[in-house]
Amino acid sequence: MTKFHFTLSVMFAMATLAISDIPLLAQQVPSSGPQVHVVVTVEARHGTNIPVINREDVVVYQGHDRDQVTGWLPLQGDHAGLELELFLLIDDAANNSLNSQLQDLREFISSQPATTAVGVGYMREGTVQIVQNLTTDHAQADKSLRLPLGDPGASPSPYFSVTDLIKRWPETQARREILMISDGIDRFYGGGPSDPYVDTAVEQAQRAGIIIFSIYSPGVGHSGHSFWRINWGQNYLSQLSDETGAESYYLGFGPPVSFVPYLDDLTHRLAHQYLLTFIAKPEKKSGMQRIRLRTEVPNAELVTAASVYVPAGS
C-alpha cells in the first residue's frame, strides 16, 4: 500500500506540474499581424479616484485569444487637445426645453483645451446641417449654437444623421468624438429590440474609431410624449454610446434641469483617455471583430468600443 500510495503521489505531482504549464503557454501572444488603434477611457469602479494605468496593466482579448499590446499613449497633458476633435450634434426635433441648456453647452465649449477643435451640427432630414466646421476658435463655435427648429418632421431618424456625419468627417490622427443631444427616437423605423439604422450607425462609428456620447433631450410631437417610443429612444442612445465606448446620460423621461452634471462627467472622461495599440489576429476577410479589455489594477475599468475593424490576413 505504501508503494502504491507513493506511485500515486508522484503521478499527481507530475500532473500538477503539467497543468501549471498550461497558463504559461496560454499567455503566449502573436507578435505579427495588423496593428489596431482604439481609444480607451479609464473609469473608477467605485468613487471618483481613477488609477493610473500603464501599458503592462492592459490585456486585450479577441474571443479567447490574447493579443499583444504594443502601445498605450496617455491622451492627457501635451496630447490632450492635439488629439481631440469634438462635434456637438443637436437634434432639430428637440422641444423648447433644450433652450435653457444652450448656455451650459456654450460654457462647455469654452472650457475645452485651446487646441481642441470643436464643430457644431444640427440633425435634420437624415443629414447634418453643419453650422460650424471644426475650429479651435471656441468663441466662434459658441456663436453658432441656435435654438432647435422643434419640428418632428425635421429628423426622421437621428441615426441617419449620425451616419451622414461619420461619412463626411475626414479621417485624421486625432481622437474623433461626438456629443449627441436627442430623444433618440427613430421616427422612420419606429421601435423594437433591433433597429437596423442604429446598428449601422454603431458599426460605422466603430469602423471609423469615433466615440459617441449622448444626452437625452425630449422631442416634439406625439412621439415626444409616447412612453413606448421614449423608452426605445433611450435604449437606442444607450446602445450607440455603450458600443462605441462612451456614456449615455438621461434621468427618467423628462428633460434634465441642467446639462452641467453630464458635461462635467464628460469632461472628466475626456481627461482619462488613452490610445491603445495592439496586434490583432486577422481573419480571412477584413471586418469587425469583438474585443474585450481587462486589467488587474484595483478599482479600474477599461471602457472602449465593443468591436474594431481588423484588416484581412495576408
Feature locations, PLM:
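Bacterial N-terminal signal peptides
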Residues: 7-21
